[in-house]
Amino acid sequence: MRTAFELVAWSAHRQPGAVALLDPESGHRLTYSELLKRIEGVATVLASRGVVRDELVATAMANTLDHAIILLALNRLGAIPVIINPRLKADEMVQLIRRDNIRTVIRTVAEGKSGTPADIDGVEELTLSAEVLSEGLRIDGNATPAFEAPRPEDPAFVFYTSGTTGLPKGVVIPHRAIEPRVLFMSTQAGLRFGGHNNLLGLMPIHHVIGFFGVFLGSLAFNGTWIPVTAFDPAQAVKWVEELDVTCLFASPTHFDALLATSEFAPEKLKSVDSVIFAGAAINQSILKRLEKCLQVPIVDIYGTTETMNSLFNPDATQERGLRPGYHSRVQFASVSESPSVALPAGVEGELVVDASADATFTHYLNNPEATAAKIVDGWYRTGDSGYVDDSGRVILTGRIDDMINTGAENVHAEEVEQIISRHPAVVEAAVVGLPDTRWGEVVTAVVVVSEPLTADLLDQVCLDSELANFKRPRRYFVVNELPRNAAMKVSRRTLREYLGAHAADQPNPETGFIQFTIEESQ
C-alpha cells in the first residue's frame, strides 16, 4: 500500500528530471525532483503552523499547481485534505465546514476573494503566500516531521458527492483505496511507465475522477499533469495541439464544447491517443463525432465518488454495455430486499457494489445514518438501475430516483433522453415526470436546440425508435440551457421547479414547444 505522497516520491526517484506539472497559462514547469522539494517545503510550513496528523483541513480551489502541492503536502503530513468544490456558494461551504467539524482551512494569496469563506467562527484560516509555495520553509527548528506510514483504513482524503438531493455528503477515502483507484484509471487511460504521457486537467481535482484518474494517475506514471483552471474550449484545443496532449479525460459536456468551438479541427488533436469520458451518459451524436474526428478507442467509465470506477467499456463506439472493473464486484438486487441476493440475468434492479473492495470508501463524514442507508449487508447501493444481459454485460437504465410513473407504467428518464438526443438539432435533453390528474405523471421532455425544431419532429424520432408508446413525451419544452448544480450535473429538482412555474403556459402553435429562459447555472 502506498500513499498519494509515496506514489509521487517513487516517480521522483525513477525520473527526477521528467516534467511533473506544467501550467499552460504561464508555461511554468516543475520536474519531479522540484515537485518533491516543494511538497516537503510546504509540509514543513503547515506543520510549523500547527497542522497535525489526522486533522481535517479544507481547501476549495481550482486546478492549479499550488492546489496540487498543498494537497500532497497535507497527505505527506498525514493530515486529511477535505476537498470542497470551489463552485459552491459561500453559505454552502460554511454549512459543510460547520457540519463536518472542520477546524482549519487553507487559502492562497492568489485566490483573492475566491476559495473557502473567510472569518468562520471557530475555524483557523491558513493563508499561504507565493513565496511559501515556491520555497517552503527550511530553518533550524522547523524540520519536516518524519513520515509515518498510515494504516490501510486510516482516512486519506474527503471528497464530496454532487449533492443533487441536498447538501453534499463527505465521502471518506482510506489510504488502502489510493493505489487501486489510480491503477485502474491509469491503465484505462493507456498510461504506461516509460511512455510519454501528457494529461490535460479538464476534470477538477475536487472530483475523484480528476484527482485519482487524471492528476494522481499522471504523476504515478511519470506523466505530466497540465491543470486547466477555467475551461475555455477554444483555448483547450490550442493547448492540446501546442503541448502534445496524449490523453483527454473529460465529461461529455467538455467534449461537446470542444467539438463545437470554431477552433476545433481534427488535425489539432493528432497527438491524442486516448479518450475517456465519465461523469454522465454521453449523447450518441457526440460519441459519433468523437469517433469520426479522433479515430482512437473511446473508453466509457462508470463510477461513483464512493466506489470509484466500478464499470467500464474499453471501446464505447463498438460495444454495448459495461464490464465490471478490475477492483470491483457488482450485481443487481431488488430495491426492497437485501442487496446480497443477486437478481438473475435480464431482470432489472438496483446496481450494488461490493463494499469490501479495496477502492471503496469507508463511510460518510459525521453521517452514520447515511452510511447505514448506503452500505447494507456488505454492499453499496448506488441508486442506479439496470440489468445484466445474456452476454454478461451490464446495461444501465437510469437513476431509480428519476423513474417516472405514468399510468402505472415505469419509464426511465435516461432511456427517453437517449432517444430524443438522436435528432442532430438536439444539443441536450432532460426528461422528467410532471404531476397529472389522469396519468399520475406525464412524461415531459426539455431540450436545448442548435437550430429551429418542432415538437412533432421529436415525437417522430420517438415513433421511429424502439421506444414503447407509453414512454413518449407528451409535453415538450425548449430552454436556453439546462440547470446544473455545482458539480455540473443536471439538476432535475430545479428543472421541475421551472416547469411547475410554466405548467399552465400554452405551446407555440407553430413549433409545439413551450419556451422559457433558465437563469444562468451556478
Swiss-Prot record:
PROSITE patterns: AMP_BINDING. Optimum temperature is 25 degrees Celsius. Its cofactor is Mg(2+). Its EC number is 6.2.1.33. Optimum pH is 7.0. It is an enzyme of class 6 (ligase). It catalyses: 4-chlorobenzoate + ATP + CoA = 4-chlorobenzoyl-CoA + AMP + diphosphate. Pathway: Xenobiotic degradation; 4-chlorobenzoate degradation; 4-hydroxybenzoate from 4-chlorobenzoate: step 2/3. Keywords: ATP-binding, Ligase, Nucleotide-binding. It comes from the Bacteria. Gene3D superfamilies: 3.30.300.30, 3.40.50.980, Luciferase, Domain 3 (2.30.38.10). GO terms for molecular function: 4-chlorobenzoate-CoA ligase activity; ATP binding; medium-chain fatty acid-CoA ligase activity. GO terms for biological process: fatty acid metabolic process. ATP binds at residues 161-169, 300-305, 410. Pfam families: AMP-binding, AMP-binding_C. Catalyzes the formation of chlorobenzoyl-CoA via a 2 step reaction. First 4-chlorobenzoate is adenylated by ATP, followed by acyl transfer from the 4-chlorobenzoyl-AMP intermediate to CoA. Benzoate, 4-bromobenzoate, 4-iodobenzoate and 4-fluorobenzoate also act as substrates. Inactive towards 4-nitrobenzoate. Belongs to the ATP-dependent AMP-binding enzyme family. Homodimer. This is 4-chlorobenzoate--CoA ligase.
